[in-house]
């Protein structure tokens, strides 16, 4: 530990944050979120680099997404650009993993007696808590979609599956 409050490989992580910010700048005019495990706590340089590039961290206020050696913090973040901020209805961390006992950890399969008696559940399915993001996508003034053709009961009239995803305006 270098004693500077930064995690391992700080210069590399700052460079990665800069590269992400440069890439995401292409979408500045579109609502864009940067979401995931940034492997940096909120006061570390990589997070500060994203904030300096104009990204607002909209997650994690007082919430922990990760626990290591009994100490909690947040390595998982949600950042929004100015175009995305009006769409946010809420952001929170779902405390389903990090605070659970390591005895229940997903990677310990075969070593845990509890797996023989417990039903499948989301607890300790990762070592990080997921971020939950609420979005308001359609306002009250949005027009209702209109069908492009009359519905048919003939199964042959259905479009055939395609390997290419379709674009939705």
In which residue ranges do the predicted regions lie?
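Metal-dependent phosphoester-hydrolase catalytic domains
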Residues: 14, 22-33, 38-147
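Active-site His/acidic residue clusters
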Residues: 1-10
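Non-membrane alpha-helical structural segments and their capping/turn regions in soluble enzymes
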Residues: 10-18
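Ser/Thr/Gly/Pro-rich low-complexity, disordered linker/stalk segments of secreted
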Residues: 140-169
């Amino acid at each position: 530990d270098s004693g500077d409050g930064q995690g391992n490989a700080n210069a590399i992580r700052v460079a990665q944050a800069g590269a992400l910010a440069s890439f995401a700048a292409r979408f500045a005019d579109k609502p864009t979120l940067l979401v995931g495990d940034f492997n940096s706590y909120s006061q570390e340089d990589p997070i500060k680099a994203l904030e300096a590039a104009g990204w607002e961290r909209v997650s994690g206020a007082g919430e922990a997404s990760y626990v290591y050696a009994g100490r909690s913090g947040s390595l998982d973040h949600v950042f929004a650009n100015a175009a995305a901020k009006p769409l946010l209805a809420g952001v929170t961390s779902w405390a389903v993993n990090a605070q659970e006992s390591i005895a229940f950890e997903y990677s310990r399969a075969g070593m845990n007696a509890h797996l023989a008696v417990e039903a499948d559940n989301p607890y300790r399915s990762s070592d990080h808590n997921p971020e939950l993001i609420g979005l308001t996508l359609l306002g009250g003034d949005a027009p209702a979609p209109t069908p492009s053709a009359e519905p048919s009961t003939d199964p042959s009239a259905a479009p055939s599956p395609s390997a290419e995803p379709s674009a939705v305006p």
